[in-house]
Regions:
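N-terminal beta-loop-helix "entrance" segment that forms/cooperates
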Residues: 31-32, 37-58, 147-151, 405
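Phosphate-binding loop of NTP-binding sites
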Residues: 3-5, 28-34, 51, 64-67, ...
Length: 471
């Protein structure tokens, strides 16, 4: 990858380098031959990987960490009173947001940016897989760990870069990709966007940033995407989805042996050429993942990638960590770890569990993520667990937020009960979760962990902890 920044530029310093969005950029820079360092509050697998690549890491934020820095990169999670940000201002060291750094990298290649409330990470991974299978060797910066790479980033030598775009703070409008994807738009991140209109305008601005020779692919199944569609007429737009009106649509969907099979019909609005790709095999379950696959197929077809390559890529795709990931089995019970933390994501994940085996009993363990999200979507959370036979609620993972009155796991339990689900429990001490699961697990064929906080550690430790408790 050729970057128009001299190799002797000095250290790129990342404040909060262990974040999934920051680490990917750092990895691309270090692999491109630049000096990279960064700080974070604690160690992690991501930090360990960066160290193995030669990144200099500081644990803890301190003004002395930036004394060798030539530029400081921060994310929206970093407050302006962070000692490293304060010191950089004193020393007149340039400070840029991660979106600006990502935008600089994207200027040097043709780029595909994937935005949306849900499905971004999986769609980014799928598009990358198709391009890789077509020997296009893309550079990748993703918002999750791609299983086949064991990383969220890859430095490729090809002409294309595929990135996950973050709509949470509106910064994705700075990216100016060649190709854009919108998977869906739900009322999320209103702490920044404030209201529905601002959120919709942010997506319109994102699409408006693509050049006249680029294009955008949008999921026409989603009502809010349909709503902004009339504002997108000055760009080339391709629609995909399950809707009969989609340009790229799935048909004849069946589930067999824990895989999805479907056909895709494609209506090319430019040359009026219509054709069908038959019998696509895909190992990720759920209609939401069919939509993610359709997004990647729409991009591939527009880039003139052959259907046989598309089919091969989807057949061989082995997923993304924490996206409906089967991580282990305890006796007869499958253990699934999923990042779902929004009601729509939870409904989609629980619906997919029924596709593993229709008569399986499902135990859902949910850790609410952020008090503000629980408050803003409380009624939706109360009604999204219908496909779980039993629900156990951990305490809210605050993610730095202050407590909100009448907005905890006990309140959610009462709400879920009021919506008609009687088999729900909230726990006082999260440390008791293994003992609680041990008493219940023999009654269930599937246990699924849902949440964006540290619940993934509980999921990954479950089998070992149950074996210890059973002795």
């Amino acid at each position: 990858m050729i970057i128009n920044i001299p190799k002797n530029f000095g250290f790129f310093h990342f404040v909060g380098i262990g974040g999934i969005g920051m680490s990917g950029i750092a990895e691309i820079l270090i692999k491109s031959g630049y000096e990279v360092q960064g700080s974070d509050v604690s160690s992690s697998k991501i930090i360990d990987r960066l160290i193995s690549l030669g990144v200099k890491i500081f644990i803890g934020h301190d003004k002395n960490n930036i004394k060798n820095a030539s530029i400081v990169v921060y994310s929206s999670a970093i407050k302006q009173n962070n000692p490293e940000i304060v010191e950089a201002k004193k020393l007149f060291i340039p400070i840029i947001h991660r979106s600006e750094m990502l935008s600089e990298l994207m200027k040097l290649k043709k780029s595909i940016a994937i935005a949306g409330t849900h499905g971004k990470t999986t769609t980014t991974s799928l598009i990358s897989k198709i391009l890789d299978t077509n020997k296009m060797d893309p550079t990748i910066i993703n918002g999750g760990i791609i299983s086949s790479l064991a990383s969220n980033a890859k430095l490729g030598q090809g002409q294309w870069m595929v990135v996950e775009a973050d709509e949470s703070d509106g910064s994705f409008s700075k990216l100016m990709p060649t190709v854009a994807v919108i998977t869906n738009i739900d009322l999320e991140h209103l702490d920044f966007h404030k209201n529905e209109k601002n959120l919709e305008n942010a997506f319109i601005n994102f699409i408006s940033s693509i050049p006249f020779y680029g294009f955008c692919s949008v999921c026409i199944d989603h009502p809010r995407v349909q709503k902004i569609f009339s504002n997108l007429k000055n760009r080339k737009i391709i629609t995909y989805g399950l809707s009969p009106n989609a340009d790229v649509k799935a048909e004849n969907i069946i589930v067999k042996n824990q895989k999805m099979y479907f056909d895709v019909t494609y209506k090319n609005k430019t040359n009026k050429d219509n054709y069908t790709i038959k019998n696509i095999s895909f190992s990720m379950l759920g209609l939401h993942n069919i939509q993610n696959a359709l997004a990647s197929i729409s991009i591939a077809l527009e880039l003139n990638i052959k259907p046989d390559i598309i089919k091969l890529a989807l057949k061989n795709f082995n997923g993304v960590q924490r996206r409906f990931q089967l991580i282990d089995t305890y006796k007869h019970t499958k253990i699934i770890d999923d990042y779902g933390h929004h009601p729509e994501e939870i409904k989609a994940a629980l619906s997919a569990t029924k596709l593993i085996a229709e008569k399986s009993k499902v135990l859902a363990i949910f850790q609410p993520h952020r008090y503000s999200r629980l408050k803003n979507h409380f009624n939706e959370f109360c009604s999204c667990f219908n496909d779980a036979d039993e629900v156990v609620l951990l305490n809210v993972y605050a993610a730095g937020e202050k407590r909100i009155a009448n907005c905890n796991n006990i309140d959610l339990e009462n709400g879920i009960r009021n919506y008609g689900h009687k088999n729900v429990t909230s726990i006082i001490n999260d440390e008791d979760i293994y003992k609680i699961i041990l008493k219940k697990i023999n009654n269930y064929q599937i246990i699924i962990f849902l949440g964006a906080g540290n619940i993934t550690k509980i999921a990954n430790n479950l089998k070992n902890e149950l074996e210890i408790l059973s002795k």
